[in-house]
């Protein structure tokens, strides 16, 4: 018994030791929390980002693509960005990579407008159905109120009168409230047409009727609502009404007319506005502009005709005056004064012709100097003049040529025959006229070949030429005959006659006009060039006799130069084109192979025309000077 306290203390110590061991083992066996990331560091920002990204995966933003929008013009988007519209009023530069990454939806502006139109039509349909339900609910409330008033017990006569007065006021308030509801409904449905005069009178009569009539009005409203049948759910076929509003189907249009007591008809199929109406208005505007333009043109033509008539009268008067002067010269009266008057009359005539040529001119004929196979020619380039040009009225001054000042005065010999009419070619000798005819024929052939090489197809002349007419003359006649009437007028020959480098062209052309009617027909034109020669034949005719040791060109049947030309006395040969222009580095003793040289020159000239590089020191044409060795 003495050892009992010791035993108790030992037991207590054992119990404490065992409990401590058990606690340590439990602490060792307890698992450590590693978290969602497997024991790694956790960041709150990353978790939030992951959650936000998971939420955004299900949402795809819609963008509107409209390259022609005015909102995108001030934005300077980068190369890898594109301008898109968030809505109708805001534009943003969006990265293409982000669009692909987020899988955003991009729609066109037309699709967006179509969806908006469908949404508005659906809203309008829902509003119509809601209006019909509201009207039905109001009618049910009115009928319930009327039934309760009729079933209420009646007392004295005063009480009945007061009840009837209250019913009248209630009915008036209800009718007014119904009228207000109808007006608000009309605004919600975008109903723009005004109420017909008959409907207004009916409403006023209904409001002015005594209290005994509400039951009749309610019955009429119920009958109208029963007649307005709602539309079933079906695939929409959009229609544009006469009120410029879009309806989803014909049933919706009828339902709208039934509710609002209107008679709106179908304007066209599809969304409003109708294209036919827009096109019709556009055609009306265009027709109005055309009418104004035609009136202006007719006035201008009338003024031009009046001016032409006045000029013709002036020309006829000038001819009469010239004839009178000739008679006076024949009688021997005041010889010197008559000569001066005749010169002034001729100058006035040429000035009037020049002015007449430029009144109705639709083109200006600008001389352009070109080179063809080492030879200079003048080619008439047709260019349209500008309407607002300050030189429009006096276009002949643009050529720096004043015919009145530079033209020499014609001097008549006192001993000459007074009965003879002064010749138009008095300033040029017959030899000069023959030479200018040969040069013109050679020039016509060059222009014809150049136009064929350039593949410029001129209009075929409908005029009839004599059988013996030369090809160059026929081609040039069709080239100058702009209106294709078979006659060359003063206007069409103006630039050809008034060449400042060739003063004998106009006298030569004047000799062609045999009937002196100020125009040249095909017969006169061909006869004028009948006695002219082509370049080689012209040189041989000019040489006249065969001098000892003189060079005589070798011509073909048509009168052009043969490719190979030889000087027999010297023993030298060279190659030329058909106009007599010598090819460089071809002069040799013996006969060279001129056909290959001509073919190579033709290909080179076509390349030179494309590059615009020509030799400025080339020799002139064969008809301009005689070859002397």
From Swiss-Prot:
Tissue specificity remark: In the wing disk, detected throughout the disk where it is localized primarily to the apical surface but is also present at the basal surface (at protein level).
Molecular functions (GO terms): calcium ion binding; serine-type endopeptidase inhibitor activity; Wnt-protein binding
Record-annotated disulphide pairs: 228-258, 231-251, 240-272, 536-555, 566-573, 575-594
Disruption phenotype: Predominantly embryonic lethal with 50% of embryos dying before cuticle formation and 10% showing a weak denticle belt fusion phenotype. RNAi-mediated knockdown in the developing wing results in development of ectopic chemosensory bristles along or near the wing margin on both the anterior and posterior sides.
TM stretches of this protein: none
Regions of compositional bias (Low complexity) in chain numbering: 144-159, 301-340, 620-629
Biased composition (Acidic residues): 128-143, 167-186, 606-619
GO cellular component: extracellular space
Organism whose genome encodes this protein: Drosophila melanogaster (Fruit fly)
PTM info: Contains heparan sulfate O-linked oligosaccharides.
UniProt name for this protein: Proteoglycan Cow
Signal peptide: 1-27
Subcellular localization(s) per the UniProt record: Secreted
